[in-house]
Amino acid sequence: MLNDTIVAISSPIGTGAIGVVRISGDHVKNIIDQALKRKKYTPKKMYYGWLYDKEGEKVDEITWVYHSQPHSYTGEDMLEIFCHGGKLITYAVLNTIIKYGARQALPGEFTKRAVLNGKMDLIKAEAVNNVITSETEISLKASFNQLKNAVSEKIKDIKNSLLNISAQIEVEMDYPDDIEFEDHDLKNKLVHIVNSMNQLLKEAENGIIAVEGVRTVIVGKPNSGKSTLLNALLRKDRAIVTDIPGTTRDTIEENLNINGIYIRLIDTAGIRYTEDTLERVGIERTINSIKNSHLILFVLDGTTPFTQEDELIYNKLNELGDKTVIIILNKSDSPNFTENNYLSLKQKNPNDFVIISAKNGAIKNLENKIYEKFFEKVNIEEPTLTNQRQKITLESSKEFVLNAINSLEKGFSNDIIMYDVRKALEKIYELSGENYTEELLDKIFSTFCVGK
């Protein structure tokens, strides 16, 4: 559908000084001619005038800029109209343009066209969305590093290396009697590619955390103060707080900013043995949330001894191994609070143990501990991958390169080695967007705002 013309409001909806309406496609010049009554104009120059409807009535007093293809964001003819801010007048401009033959753009469709027209690759397109949706300066920094094409250039280098190897093998296959390359030379080139991939993958998880947030799960036995802690961290009442164990039967998700670190916080059902069907479903969701988390906040009730339920959770968390766990002794405000029941646990985990009062909001030491655990991970200086799609696709490409090295070492024929090199290339093309499916693009751009 790239031959049609699209339009969308690109500014936030609501009262403001200026509204922005963006148009892209083959019909842009006709719209300028008919709706703006302008015959001569220069690209990249701002003009003042009126927008007219099809009956010749003035819709709004505007300024506008024309961008000629291919020197525009989408690579197509584009028109950007700057009208008076406000919901009614901005929608009036939008509807006027639609009556001149444009259609309402889909989410992310302008950027999707930019990718399809070769103005940017898929990695940069995802970075555009990340920059817009960044919640913290750290996530903005990681996203902006991608926006500057640094990651794309590294992927391009990997692609070119694979293309050169593919060409080298193909020449040898076409002229086996005349040309024969040394196996160790080919292996060294493949190993160099794997090393380049490893360099990107090494910081990938931290890049994902920086942009998408630290997936943080609050766990503990029922009535240990998990929901109170959630509310304290958010500085608002989000979860129901009662003295009845098992009140939280579903996961509650919220986002917050702790000293510049983006936290995706999940309050979960308390873990215990129960016959209650709904509560058991909640506990299953808790376990799934734990498996997918980066950080686990294990809440203990400081007014009670360390129970079998606490021990069950503690042992389960230890089995995970690679998770960051902070043990939180809660309810320090209570006259029944005592640290004595948990001294052994504190001695085993001296750097991961904090005492708080969630009820009174005395949680600064917990926030400092979270910052201490994750600041170095997310404060990334080097450009890196920033989502699971990018990471998984590059890992898949790397597996094919490793297969090619293995085939080479075992003395397999060139056509077998070539198969893996080509499959590795296919994954690199998928990563950059040179090889795509509509399903992939729809999934990526559906998360964009309309007008971008």
UniProtKB/Swiss-Prot annotation:
The entry's GTP-binding residues are 223-228, 242-248, 267-270
TrmE-type G domain mapped to chain residues: 213-375
Q: Which cofactor does it need?
A: K(+)
What is one process in the GO biological process aspect for this record? Answer: tRNA methylation
Annotated Mg(2+) binding sites: S227, T248
- Establish whether keyword Cytoplasm is in the entry: yes
The record's disulfide annotation reads: none
Q: Which sites bind (6S)-5-formyl-5,6,7,8-tetrahydrofolate?
A: R22, E80, K119, K452
Q: Which UniProt keywords apply?
A: Cytoplasm, GTP-binding, Hydrolase, Magnesium, Metal-binding, Nucleotide-binding, Potassium, tRNA processing
Top EC category: hydrolase
Q: Which residues bind K(+)?
A: N223, T242, I244, T247
Kindly list the GO CC terms recorded for this protein.
cytosol
> How is the cofactor bound here?
Binds 1 potassium ion per subunit.
Role according to the record: Exhibits a very high intrinsic GTPase hydrolysis rate. Involved in the addition of a carboxymethylaminomethyl (cmnm) group at the wobble position (U34) of certain tRNAs, forming tRNA-cmnm(5)s(2)U34.
Q: How does it assemble?
A: Homodimer. Heterotetramer of two MnmE and two MnmG subunits.
The family classification in the record reads: Belongs to the TRAFAC class TrmE-Era-EngA-EngB-Septin-like GTPase superfamily. TrmE GTPase family.
HAMAP family xrefs: GTPase_MnmE
Q: Which NCBIfam families match?
A: mnmE_trmE_thdF (TIGR00450), small_GTP (TIGR00231)
Protein name (record):
tRNA modification GTPase MnmE
